[in-house]
Amino acid sequence: MTDYLNVGKIVNTQGIKGEVRVISKTDFPEERYQKGAMLLLFQEKKAPIELVVKSHRKHKNFDILSFEGHPNINDVEKYRDGILKVAKDNLAELAEDEFYYHQIIGATVYDETGSELGKIKEILSPGANDVWVVQRPKKKDLLLPYIEGVVTKVDVENQRIDVDIPEGLIDDEN
Protein backbone atom coordinates (compact mmCIF):
# COMPACT_ATOMS: atom_id res chain seq x y z
CA MET A 1 0.00 0.00 0.00
CA THR A 2 1.28 3.46 -0.90
CA ASP A 3 1.85 6.07 1.79
CA TYR A 4 0.86 9.66 1.11
CA LEU A 5 1.94 13.04 2.45
CA ASN A 6 -0.30 16.09 2.82
CA VAL A 7 0.72 19.05 0.68
CA GLY A 8 -2.33 21.26 1.21
CA LYS A 9 -6.02 21.70 1.93
CA ILE A 10 -8.55 23.21 -0.47
CA VAL A 11 -10.41 25.81 1.58
CA ASN A 12 -12.46 27.60 -1.07
CA THR A 13 -12.88 28.47 -4.72
CA GLN A 14 -11.28 31.56 -6.28
CA GLY A 15 -13.20 33.37 -8.99
CA ILE A 16 -15.27 31.58 -11.63
CA LYS A 17 -12.56 29.98 -13.79
CA GLY A 18 -12.03 26.77 -11.81
CA GLU A 19 -9.38 27.99 -9.40
CA VAL A 20 -9.18 26.87 -5.77
CA ARG A 21 -7.57 28.41 -2.69
CA VAL A 22 -5.15 26.09 -0.95
CA ILE A 23 -3.59 26.39 2.48
CA SER A 24 -0.26 24.82 1.74
CA LYS A 25 1.44 22.27 4.01
CA THR A 26 4.53 21.78 1.86
CA ASP A 27 7.96 23.36 2.00
CA PHE A 28 8.19 22.97 -1.77
CA PRO A 29 5.15 24.70 -3.32
CA GLU A 30 7.04 25.51 -6.55
CA GLU A 31 7.71 21.80 -7.07
CA ARG A 32 4.42 20.38 -5.78
CA TYR A 33 2.20 22.81 -7.67
CA GLN A 34 4.16 23.17 -10.91
CA LYS A 35 2.26 22.82 -14.16
CA GLY A 36 1.76 19.13 -14.93
CA ALA A 37 2.29 17.94 -11.34
CA MET A 38 -0.05 15.15 -10.27
CA LEU A 39 -1.83 15.50 -6.93
CA LEU A 40 -4.30 13.21 -5.24
CA LEU A 41 -7.43 14.72 -3.71
CA PHE A 42 -8.71 12.90 -0.64
CA GLN A 43 -12.21 13.60 0.62
CA GLU A 44 -14.16 11.93 3.42
CA LYS A 45 -15.30 8.42 2.51
CA LYS A 46 -14.53 8.87 -1.21
CA ALA A 47 -11.91 7.29 -3.42
CA PRO A 48 -8.95 9.61 -4.13
CA ILE A 49 -9.16 11.67 -7.32
CA GLU A 50 -6.10 12.33 -9.50
CA LEU A 51 -5.72 16.00 -10.39
CA VAL A 52 -3.12 17.48 -12.75
CA VAL A 53 -2.05 21.05 -11.99
CA LYS A 54 -2.81 23.46 -14.83
CA SER A 55 -1.65 26.66 -13.12
CA HIS A 56 -0.33 27.94 -9.81
CA ARG A 57 0.07 31.40 -8.33
CA LYS A 58 0.36 32.95 -4.89
CA HIS A 59 -2.33 35.29 -3.55
CA LYS A 60 -2.04 36.66 -0.02
CA ASN A 61 -1.51 33.60 2.23
CA PHE A 62 -2.94 31.12 -0.27
CA ASP A 63 -1.69 29.06 -3.17
CA ILE A 64 -4.18 29.40 -6.02
CA LEU A 65 -4.39 26.29 -8.22
CA SER A 66 -6.33 25.26 -11.28
CA PHE A 67 -6.52 21.73 -12.64
CA GLU A 68 -6.61 20.21 -16.13
CA GLY A 69 -10.19 19.46 -17.22
CA HIS A 70 -11.75 21.74 -14.58
CA PRO A 71 -12.34 25.06 -16.39
CA ASN A 72 -15.01 26.62 -14.16
CA ILE A 73 -16.17 27.03 -10.58
CA ASN A 74 -18.85 24.33 -10.90
CA ASP A 75 -16.13 21.73 -11.57
CA VAL A 76 -14.19 22.47 -8.38
CA GLU A 77 -16.77 23.55 -5.78
CA LYS A 78 -17.18 19.94 -4.71
CA TYR A 79 -13.46 19.74 -3.82
CA ARG A 80 -13.77 22.22 -0.93
CA ASP A 81 -12.27 20.86 2.33
CA GLY A 82 -10.42 18.17 0.38
CA ILE A 83 -6.83 17.30 1.24
CA LEU A 84 -4.20 17.34 -1.51
CA LYS A 85 -1.53 14.65 -1.19
CA VAL A 86 1.46 13.19 -3.01
CA ALA A 87 2.79 9.65 -2.85
CA LYS A 88 5.83 9.29 -0.57
CA ASP A 89 7.75 7.56 -3.34
CA ASN A 90 7.37 10.66 -5.55
CA LEU A 91 9.43 12.85 -3.22
CA ALA A 92 12.53 14.55 -4.57
CA GLU A 93 15.95 13.67 -3.22
CA LEU A 94 17.25 16.23 -0.74
CA ALA A 95 20.78 17.40 -0.02
CA GLU A 96 22.73 15.44 2.57
CA ASP A 97 21.95 17.81 5.45
CA GLU A 98 18.24 18.18 4.59
CA PHE A 99 15.25 16.05 5.55
CA TYR A 100 11.48 15.85 5.28
CA TYR A 101 9.40 16.36 8.42
CA HIS A 102 7.98 12.85 8.28
CA GLN A 103 11.52 11.47 8.50
CA ILE A 104 12.13 12.93 11.97
CA ILE A 105 8.73 12.37 13.58
CA GLY A 106 9.42 9.70 16.19
CA ALA A 107 13.18 10.39 16.28
CA THR A 108 14.80 10.35 19.71
CA VAL A 109 16.18 13.64 21.07
CA TYR A 110 19.32 13.73 23.22
CA ASP A 111 20.73 16.69 25.17
CA GLU A 112 24.36 17.81 25.25
CA THR A 113 25.17 15.27 28.01
CA GLY A 114 23.81 12.39 25.92
CA SER A 115 20.70 11.99 28.08
CA GLU A 116 17.51 11.06 26.27
CA LEU A 117 14.88 13.83 26.41
CA GLY A 118 12.08 12.17 24.44
CA LYS A 119 10.78 11.74 20.90
CA ILE A 120 9.68 14.23 18.25
CA LYS A 121 5.88 14.18 18.33
CA GLU A 122 5.06 16.93 15.84
CA ILE A 123 6.44 19.99 14.12
CA LEU A 124 4.80 23.40 14.41
CA SER A 125 5.43 26.29 11.99
CA PRO A 126 4.24 29.35 13.92
CA GLY A 127 6.38 31.95 12.20
CA ALA A 128 10.07 32.78 12.03
CA ASN A 129 11.27 29.25 12.76
CA ASP A 130 9.81 25.80 13.23
CA VAL A 131 9.18 24.43 16.71
CA TRP A 132 9.65 20.74 17.37
CA VAL A 133 7.37 19.22 20.00
CA VAL A 134 9.34 16.67 22.04
CA GLN A 135 7.18 14.20 23.95
CA ARG A 136 8.95 13.42 27.22
CA PRO A 137 8.10 10.43 29.39
CA LYS A 138 6.03 11.47 32.43
CA LYS A 139 6.77 15.18 31.84
CA LYS A 140 5.28 18.07 29.90
CA ASP A 141 6.09 18.28 26.20
CA LEU A 142 9.19 20.31 25.38
CA LEU A 143 8.83 22.99 22.70
CA LEU A 144 12.20 23.03 20.98
CA PRO A 145 13.00 25.84 18.51
CA TYR A 146 14.61 24.55 15.32
CA ILE A 147 17.44 27.06 15.17
CA GLU A 148 21.19 26.88 14.77
CA GLY A 149 22.84 26.42 18.14
CA VAL A 150 19.91 24.47 19.61
CA VAL A 151 19.59 21.58 17.16
CA THR A 152 23.21 20.51 16.71
CA LYS A 153 22.83 17.28 14.71
CA VAL A 154 20.05 15.45 12.88
CA ASP A 155 20.78 11.81 12.00
CA VAL A 156 17.77 10.68 9.97
CA GLU A 157 19.12 7.18 9.34
CA ASN A 158 19.58 6.41 13.05
CA GLN A 159 16.55 8.48 14.15
CA ARG A 160 18.73 10.54 16.53
CA ILE A 161 18.67 14.28 17.14
CA ASP A 162 21.28 16.00 19.31
CA VAL A 163 20.41 19.32 20.91
CA ASP A 164 22.02 21.94 23.12
CA ILE A 165 19.26 23.12 25.46
CA PRO A 166 19.40 26.86 26.27
CA GLU A 167 19.21 27.72 29.95
CA GLY A 168 15.60 28.17 31.09
CA LEU A 169 14.02 26.25 28.19
CA ILE A 170 13.15 23.24 30.32
CA ASP A 171 10.87 23.99 33.25
CA ASP A 172 10.24 20.74 35.10
CA GLU A 173 8.68 22.47 38.08
CA ASN A 174 5.17 22.13 36.60
Curated annotation (Swiss-Prot):
Please give the InterPro entries that the UniProt record associates with this protein. Answer: PRC-brl_dom, PRC_barrel-like_sf, RimM, RimM_N, RimM_N_sf, Transl_B-barrel_sf
Compartments, record wording:
Cytoplasm
Q: Which GO terms describe its cellular component?
A: cytoplasm; ribosome
User: What keywords are annotated for this sequence in UniProt?
Assistant: Chaperone, Cytoplasm, Ribosome biogenesis, rRNA processing
Q: What positions does the domain PRC barrel occupy?
A: 96-169
Q: What's the domain of life for this entry? A: Bacteria
Does the record carry Lipoprotein as a key word?
no
Concerning Pfam families, the annotation shows: PRC, RimM
User: MF terms per GO, please?
Assistant: ribosome binding
Q: Which GO terms describe its biological process?
A: ribosomal small subunit biogenesis; rRNA processing
Report the SS bond pairs.
none
Plastid recorded as keyword: no
What's its job?
An accessory protein needed during the final step in the assembly of 30S ribosomal subunit, possibly for assembly of the head region. Essential for efficient processing of 16S rRNA. May be needed both before and after RbfA during the maturation of 16S rRNA. It has affinity for free ribosomal 30S subunits but not for 70S ribosomes.
Q: Cite the record's note on assembly.
A: Binds ribosomal protein uS19.
Q: What is known of its domains?
A: The PRC barrel domain binds ribosomal protein uS19.
Q: Which family does it belong to?
A: Belongs to the RimM family.
Q: Which HAMAP family match?
A: Ribosome_mat_RimM
Query: What's the name of the protein?
Result: Ribosome maturation factor RimM
Source organism per entry reads Enterococcus faecalis (strain ATCC 700802 / V583)
